[in-house]
């Protein structure tokens, strides 16, 4: 997939051409929450009805399913750790070039590489086939409990003057004029994605922050089997009459993805529920986790970030560091054992 960059930009523009198209893209992101927007767009282009994708060995060895010889794989992108070369000009103490020859040396770097994956619909179950893990959606109570733990907020009963459930950030209070648990959970998720969007984009205009937050909430609600009651309100104003360029659309989808995934990770952790690893994070674990030394692995990830210009890969490495930092030594040992036992493969989802 030599022209994957152009393909992604074309698909991003099509997926954000108007509010209706954006909603469909958000649904696709919610259906494949472990995939980055890059891979969601590529998957939707090749196999729009896919439900769970995994590698050949994941299906045949772990899930004990058969893949027919003539089945056609989907081609996605995976992070690949390799060796590149950095070039530097020799300088004196005043940083003036003193040599016209650059000094080259090898350095560990990270980039994208194509990978062949297959949807579960292309496999044939055998006797003793393993079930594919689902996304473990949080319950409505889990969402509210996790949100209150994260925000350390109060709950207040208010008169019905506007929204039936709303997180008041200024008062740090979940204001309720209803007992409908679904609406309360939705208010909690909207409050959390707004908090995460503002944290990610502190110097950005409020319209864009609001758009990222409402779209991230839409994805997060769908992941947890809650039908959003709110529409996407900010897109038309942000998009304008003439629209944006494809790079801006792809950046928007990335910001939505990063905001929703961090909110989900923090919410699951606060609610005492298993944390899931994204596809890019699993690929990095497979390549880098050669021991159960958490600090060593995190240092490797931080070093990799210095040697890539791909924002999605930078985020994947940073997010993996953040998740590892949540776990105690026993949990890290379990991840390492799973990796050694080939349980961490290019699976549809890895949860611990």
Could you describe each region identified by the protein language model?
Residues 1-284, 349-352:
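N-terminal accessory/interface modules of nucleic-acid-binding and processing proteins
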Residues 190, 258, 296-299, 315:
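Generic structural signal for well-ordered, non-membrane alpha-helices
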Residues 285-289, 302, 318:
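Amphipathic alpha-helical repeat scaffolds
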Residues 290-296, 305-315, 325-332:
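Charged, low-complexity interaction regions
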